[in-house]
């Protein structure tokens, strides 16, 4: 809602308003000013909750991400470990911590695994210790300005379904498993995830199904079935 006072001021001063909607569901603030704006920039014209009579205002653009996300290329090495990136953010780190660590330790007994995982600052040492004890190569962080470098190292990402993160992953052709936040307003995270799933870029797992058994089964399947993984990657 940071755009609300800016748009109110622009309306009062007679300044032209241009909106950006990165989600697949039209946000409430954008909905409020849609009638007053000149254009609304989106990643698709198939926005949920968008008035048909105002669709002429839509201008489709490529996702707005930092330049370095477009510049990164895959790092290719022989016999490299399968690298999993886990990006939780403030609303995903705890549930990801509880499930991912056990699965990675189990998978590492039969597979060469590397883990790059975001967690809360208070949990970095504990999580690092668990992976170190299991002799798993790991990078544990609470915040990283240059996320593009970490995405570049990874083979697969586990993430929520925020618009920015999914756009960054898709730009870099990284397949991802997304667990949409169930409490997101207007269910916009599920709609974001569904958009990329329809493009063939990702898999969706509902939060109620996100547990040790299902995640380990999924990752085992991906590691053993490179053809399915490569189809997602090429999309």
Give, region by region, the residue ranges found by the protein language model.
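Acidic donor-binding loop of glycosyltransferase active sites
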Residues: 152-167, 174-175
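Short alpha-helical segment that forms part of, or immediately flanks, the ligand-binding pocket
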Residues: 8, 148, 166-174, 194
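Short hydrophobic beta-strand element within catalytic cores of glycosyltransferases
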Residues: 159, 175-186
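Alpha-helix C-terminal capping/helix-to-coil transition sites in glycosyltransferase folds
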Residues: 35-36, 149-153, 171
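Active-site-proximal region of nucleotide-activated glycan assembly enzymes
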Residues: 11-72, 198
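Donor-nucleotide binding loops and adjacent catalytic segments primarily
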Residues: 73, 77-156, 190-194, 205-215
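An aromatic- and histidine-rich active-site surface loop
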Residues: 1-13
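Conserved donor-nucleotide binding/catalytic region of nucleotide-linked donor-dependent transferases
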Residues: 203, 208-235
């Amino acid at each position: 809602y940071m755009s609300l006072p800016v748009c109110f001021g622009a309306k009062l001063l007679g300044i032209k308003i241009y909106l950006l909607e990165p989600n697949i569901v039209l946000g409430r603030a954008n909905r409020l000013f849609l009638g007053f704006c000149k254009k609304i920039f989106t990643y698709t014209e198939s926005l949920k909750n968008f008035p048909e009579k105002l669709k002429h205002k839509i201008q489709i653009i490529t996702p707005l991400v930092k330049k370095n996300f477009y510049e990164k290329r895959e790092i290719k090495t022989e016999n490299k470990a399968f690298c999993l990136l886990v990006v939780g953010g403030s609303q995903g780190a705890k549930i990801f911590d509880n499930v991912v660590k056990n699965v990675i330790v189990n998978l590492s007994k039969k597979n060469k695994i590397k883990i790059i995982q975001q967690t809360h600052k208070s949990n970095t040492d504990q999580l690092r210790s668990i992976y170190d004890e299991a002799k798993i190569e790991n990078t544990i962080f609470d915040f990283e300005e240059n996320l593009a470098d970490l995405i570049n190292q990874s083979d697969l990402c586990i993430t929520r379904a925020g618009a920015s993160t999914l756009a960054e992953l898709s730009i870099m052709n990284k397949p991802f498993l997304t667990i949409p936040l169930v409490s997101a307003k207007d269910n916009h995270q599920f709609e974001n995830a569904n958009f990329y799933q329809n493009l063939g870029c990702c898999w969706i797992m509902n939060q109620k199904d996100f547990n040790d058994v299902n995640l380990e089964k999924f990752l085992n399947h991906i590691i053993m079935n490179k053809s399915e993984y490569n189809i997602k990657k090429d999309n």
